[in-house]
Design a protein with these regions (language model features):
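Glycine/small-residue-rich phosphate/adenosyl-binding loop
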Residues: 40, 51-54, 121-205
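Generic N-terminal amphipathic, Lys/Arg-enriched alpha-helix
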Residues: 61-67, 82-97
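Glycine-rich, charged/polar anion/phosphate-binding loops
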Residues: 110-112, 163-168, 235-237, 260
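Small-aliphatic-rich amphipathic alpha-helix that forms the alpha element of a beta-alpha
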Residues: 88, 107-112, 186-237
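Short, electropositive alpha-helical surface patch
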Residues: 234-248
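C-terminal helix-cap and adjacent tail motif
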Residues: 8-17, 27-44, 51-64, 69, ...
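Glycine-rich phosphate/pyrophosphate-binding beta-alpha loops
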Residues: 115-119
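An N-terminal domain-cap segment
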Residues: 91-114
Length: 277
């Protein structure tokens, strides 16, 4: 369910941003690195020298022996895991207590175990703990969100958000001890300089985000799933990310504030989301 929500949100956000950029004729500028000499994206399928697999064709296949468990134990673990994940909530008020670096390393490593199209692993996880950088991120997002709420977002969209008590002011971006920004790599470059396509990069990154949220919940932290509208270029420049990367998700991560509250809402029942055939 986490993955489905993230996938829909990412696709919806991308369509809105693309439409907006087309209207305003937005031009991308990269303040930190000079990518002016970057090779143009082109289809090299007609070039015989290009038709080399992303990983060696003779990559050996090895036995796979996951831990064997009796079905009774599998059932027990499925119940325990559901009970844990059912407690996950989106939180907008965070404790400022720092997170050990090893915890952040482990949850990102867990996200990196996600499957991806043709094993391209098209993701970059930028973990921000520096207070000045967090403030710069907050300023960018609040600038754009003020415009989003007043002009870009439909009245129905804004109305639908009212029960969640959210607006263009985002204190959690500086309160949370860490921000994890997930960037999607649309392509990369092979060692020989040829472009390496990242197939199904959107769904691959969406699945990885689901893994990331599950890891955050499992270790006892909380997060907010945020998809900053029209912030991609400015945040990418701020964090020195290359032009083949696009921001897909921003997660403030930490412990919940001691006075945090969440909306009293219920998830759909199993019979509303599952069909057995």
């Amino acid at each position: 369910m986490i993955v489905c929500f993230i996938t829909f949100t990412i696709f919806h956000k991308n369509r809105i941003e693309l439409a907006h950029q087309n209207r305003i004729g937005a031009k991308k500028k990269f303040a930190i690195h000079d990518y002016s000499k970057e090779k143009e994206q082109q289809d090299d399928d007609d070039d015989p020298d290009y038709l080399v697999s992303a990983i060696p064709e003779d990559t050996p296949h090895i036995p796979y022996k996951p831990l064997a468990r009796p079905m009774e134990k599998i059932l027990e673990r499925s119940r325990e895991y559901y009970d844990l994940m059912a407690k996950r909530r989106t939180v907008r008020s965070f404790s400022t207590e720092p997170i050990p670096q090893e915890v952040l390393d482990n949850i990102v490593k867990t996200a990196g175990t996600s499957p991806s199209g043709a094993f391209t692993e098209p993701w970059t996880f930028v973990v921000v703990q520096d207070p000045e950088v967090k403030l710069a991120i907050r300023n960018i997002i609040e600038d754009e969100e003020e415009i989003n709420y007043s002009r870009r977002m439909s009245r129905q969209w804004v109305t639908d958000l009212k029960p969640f008590a959210t607006n263009h002011i985002k204190p959690y971006l500086t309160d949370a001890p860490a921000l994890i920004l997930v960037f999607r790599q649309t392509y990369s470059w092979r060692a020989d300089g040829k472009k390496k396509m990242h197939y199904y990069n959107e769904i691959s990154v969406a699945i990885a985000c689901g893994f990331l949220l599950a890891a955050i919940q499992y270790c006892g932290l909380v997060a907010l799933t945020s998809t900053p509208l029209n912030c991609n270029t400015r945040l990418r420049d701020l964090l020195s990310r290359p032009p083949n990367e696009r921001l897909e998700l921003l997660l403030p991560v930490g412990k919940p504030h001691e006075d945090v509250t969440v909306p009293d809402i219920k998830r759909k029942n199993l019979d509303e989301i599952m069909i057995n055939v």
